[in-house]
Regions:
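Noncatalytic, typically N-terminal accessory segments of nucleic acid-processing enzymes
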Residues: 1-380
Length: 380
């Protein structure tokens, strides 16, 4: 990384006479690239300007962060979909996404046939939409087990949202509370509870019919079988599990699910998941809690029915404690070296160097075996 940073600085110096402003935010500056990029855009561009901001990339994080950026009307994302790197520029195929138009279509779709949304701002609708997408899974939390993108999960969650909004006639996310770090009232937990309830009504049908249908399709595991056949040596530290130990299409799948993923206390898992939703919401909102230490300690997330049951019994107690939750308090950033140790291969030279030190605390951050269970769903 040091060599890369030096090379980037050299490139920046070489471009001094090209009338370009080059901003480098390297690994020594805390934060993910997309978030740092959005902060730079917000701090360096006039929101009243008509100048277009072009960003290379089309991943979900980048799209969602662009939707809630104060300059969203000016942002255009693009990506080169040409896999042949030898093609000249004129023959390349690019995909463009106009964030302003996307925002308009999302709001139009949410408002269609629902007069109860007329008092809710477009920005608030976008925040609601993004929060609902958290339930589909992201870099920090897995998806709700009965929600899969390839099985129309987004449409399912939006139907639940429209049903609930008819009842409450107010947004799911309170932007004033969110911007003031008032966690207790930034999410309408009664609405979220009802969304979980509506999701839970079709849970058993989903696993018995929809989920088990494609799980029986052996072709979706072809690449995994090929990888496992390669990793047969005694020293191999990666293995992909394909057998469906949980048997979702049989009675008792919930108990087997929690047992398989070593979830002993379901209430604790539900609480951790909900705290995770608050953390991610704050993270997307300019990282307003400035917390760098939170992580979800379980491999998978609870069922919608269990999240509903948890909120029915524990909502008030949860809200009493959320403003004082350690995971939503400011903390120190993890160093670049610590981050590297979280992902380094066991036999790396850097790891060997620290092993010689004997008492290095960083050694505890190394992984030794990696097992991937593909039974939770196909690549989405």
């Amino acid at each position: 990384m040091d060599n890369l940073i030096k090379s980037l600085e050299t490139f920046k110096n070489q471009m001094k006479n090209e009338n370009l402003e080059i901003i480098i935010s390297d690994s020594n500056i805390c934060g993910e690239g997309e978030h740092k990029m959005m902060k730079i855009i917000s701090n360096n561009y006039d929101k009243n300007s008509n100048k277009k901001i072009c960003i290379y990339g089309l991943d979900a994080d980048l799209i969602m962060l662009s939707l809630i950026n104060q300059l969203s009307n000016n942002i255009i994302l693009l990506r080169d979909n040409t896999f042949n790197t030898k093609l000249n520029e004129s023959k390349r195929i690019y995909t463009y996404l106009n964030i302003c138009k996307l925002k308009t279509y999302i709001c139009k779709d949410l408002r269609f046939g629902n007069n109860n949304l007329s008092e809710i701002s477009d920005l608030n609708l976008i925040y609601d939409y993004i929060f609902l997408c958290f339930l589909m899974g992201n870099d920090f939390l897995e998806h709700i087990p009965s929600l899969l993108i390839k099985e129309g999960g987004i449409n399912v969650i939006l139907k639940c949202y429209n049903f609930v909004i008819d009842k409450y006639k107010s947004p799911l996310i309170n932007l004033n509370s969110l911007n003031n770090n008032d966690w207790k009232s930034c999410i309408n937990l009664d609405m979220l509870k009802d969304i979980f309830y509506n999701l839970s009504k079709s849970e058993s049908y989903f696993f018995t019919n929809i989920y088990s249908a494609y799980k029986s399709n052996k072709s979706i595991y072809k690449d995994i079988y090929d990888l496992n056949s390669i990793n047969t040596t005694e020293n191999s530290n990666i293995y992909f599990y394909t057998e469906d130990k949980i048997k979702y299409n049989e009675t008792g799948y919930k108990s087997r699910y929690y047992q398989y993923y070593n979830v002993i206390n379901i209430n604790s898992a539900c609480e951790s998941y909900l705290i995770g939703l608050y953390w991610i919401l704050g993270y997307y909102n300019n990282h307003c809690h400035n917390n760098w230490s939170w992580y979800y300690e379980y491999h998978e997330v609870p069922f919608a029915s269990d999240l509903y049951s948890y909120l029915c019994k524990n909502k008030n107690k949860f809200l009493e404690n959320i403003n004082y939750c350690e995971s939503l308090q400011s903390s120190s950033c993890i160093s670049s070296l610590e981050q590297l140790f979280l992902v380094l291969p066991k036999e790396s030279l850097l790891e060997k160097y620290f092993l010689k030190q004997g008492n290095s605390k960083l050694i505890t951050k190394l992984f030794t075996f990696f097992g991937f269970f593909s039974g939770g769903g196909i690549w989405q």
